[in-house]
């Protein structure tokens, strides 16, 4: 369940974004079978949810987004595992950088002060 919740949260958070990938229902099924178990949802319910993500991401397929997170184990899992799942399922490539908490804050401040888009999303727990 934890893996499923993390995957759903990551996919939802990353759909905001800003170049090379293809959405794939077969990939969604592979991830459901091999990584997103156990889950409180049945595999059919999970696939229905993944189909929604594939459809929602369709206009953005082939895009590439940059995400910054602080260095904690949850974010390492997101960076190492869920970014691959996200790209295979949605067609959106995620460049996920992990830095220390202070560096994340500094990056956010820099982006706000300069108006220069450094990252498309920030993940902070």
Model-assigned labels for residue ranges:
Residues 14, 37-40, 44, 95, ...:
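Short N-terminal micro-motifs specific to bacterial/archaeal maturation
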Residues 62-64, 91-94, 118-119:
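A common structural microfeature
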Residues 69-79, 96-125:
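Ligand-binding clamshell of periplasmic/extracellular solute-binding protein-like
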Residues 23-67, 87-88:
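Immediate post-signal peptide segment of exported/extracytoplasmic ligand-binding proteins
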Residues 49-56, 73-93:
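Short, polar/charged alpha-helical segment
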Residues 1-23:
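Gram-negative bacterial Sec-dependent N-terminal signal peptides
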Residues 7, 16, 58-60, 87, ...:
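Generic structural signal for beta-strand residues in well-ordered domains
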């Amino acid at each position: 369940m934890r893996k499923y919740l993390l995957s759903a949260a990551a996919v939802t958070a990353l759909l905001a974004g800003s170049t090379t990938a293809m959405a794939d229902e077969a990939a969604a099924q592979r991830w459901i079978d091999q990584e997103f178990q156990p889950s409180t949802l049945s595999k059919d319910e999970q696939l229905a949810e993944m189909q929604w993500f594939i459809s929602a991401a369709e206009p953005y397929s082939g895009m590439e987004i940059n995400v910054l997170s602080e260095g904690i184990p949850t974010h390492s899992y997101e960076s190492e595992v869920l970014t691959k799942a996200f790209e295979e399922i949605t067609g959106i490539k995620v460049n996920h950088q992990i830095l220390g908490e202070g560096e994340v804050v500094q990056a956010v401040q820099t982006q706000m002060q300069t108006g220069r888009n450094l990252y498309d999303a920030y993940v902070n727990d």
